[in-house]
């Protein structure tokens, strides 16, 4: 079983799909579970939105532990802590909470997302706009556990052989791994496979894609699409706007816009009701 815990719904879905597209039956929980989760089958993935990104550090830590307590993990199960590749939210606190709750010794954190131009080198996250964030300093400042760093040169020359070094270190251990290419992320995943006990993997959807999947079935055909598909977005990012325009051009998307001015300055329920009524009409067509 593959268990993913993310701090928001986007992270839960874009990580879950990395397993679904390789033949692993994947379920996404859109909100934190309130009761114990049934133990899924061997070739399944469960991706949970903990809704913790906007919480304060201690609340995020507590929320992560609460979610972890709802699932029974076996030694052979893969645990993946999804973090934002821009490292927003409380990535260190949540990773520590997941590692502690799972009773595992080592967390392998490789948050790079090379296809998005987000890479980690020298422990520093570098973004396409030229900005940077010192992740190694962030980990050392906010972690209560031991922290180590695998530089890019060591990753590429030693690869999975680094596992032997990690098991000799103080545990529990948070290990930050440099990665500039997708091949680097595959090397990071190989370290986890070489450990004598299962780690907690931590990263973006790119690391999830790099993880080996037992009995992988590449190019699994998608199930037939539903008669109607509802797409919901509240993002102000230009990339999201471009995606919506693409859907309009390719799929004949019908848009129902919520008027933010009315939500702020008029009774919000009226605007919400108007949008819901129009959505209902479209979905019934």
Where are the regions that the model predicts?
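Short amphipathic alpha-helices and their capping/turn segments at secondary-structure boundaries
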Residues: 37, 98-103, 272-284
